[in-house]
Amino acid sequence: LNEQGMSAYCYTGSYQIPVHTLTDSIVKDIMMIQEIIGTGEIAISDHRSSQPTFEEFARVVADTRLGGVLSGKAGIVNVHLGDSPRCLDLIERVVDETEIPASQILPTHINRNEMLFGKSIEYALKGGAVDFTGNEDIDYWETICDEVRVCNGIKRMLDAGDIVTIGMRGDG
């Protein structure tokens, strides 16, 4: 894509921690590979995650931030959120218990259910950005899974003064 005049960037990593990297180091991947701007999509609060501890998750975020600082890149960690009642607990602990700012962690799928959405508004009001996921069959997801419809969620976020992004994925 870059050769065709488009800008294309990516993350290093995987759902699980320890993350899979190209150089065996998050910091090295971000510093040495031009297109890598952060780490993701790390799964937490979900049955698909590796159930990382606070220390493991905080280390991934810290390494990603360090790689970003040293390379002049974003150093963002994109975090896949499931529908566990723990919601953003690990993310909030990193922000509250370390020197890493909320702006370094981008939780996605925040409209997965009403409880998670409410917690995400609180997180965004503390300085974090959040990411919606637009789904194909919105009636199904809203009715069966308690998902917050993107258009309604965006309005609620904007009314609260929050910063939002919308994730579009080719595979759902």
What are these regions (language model features)?
Residues 1-56:
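Divalent-metal coordination cores built from histidine and acidic residues
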Residues 49, 56, 62-155, 165-170:
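Active-site core of metal-dependent hydrolases
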Residues 4-5, 127, 161:
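Glycine-centered loop/turn motif at secondary-structure junctions
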Residues 156-160:
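Redox- and metal-dependent alpha/beta enzyme cores, enriched for Fe-S-associated oxidoreductases
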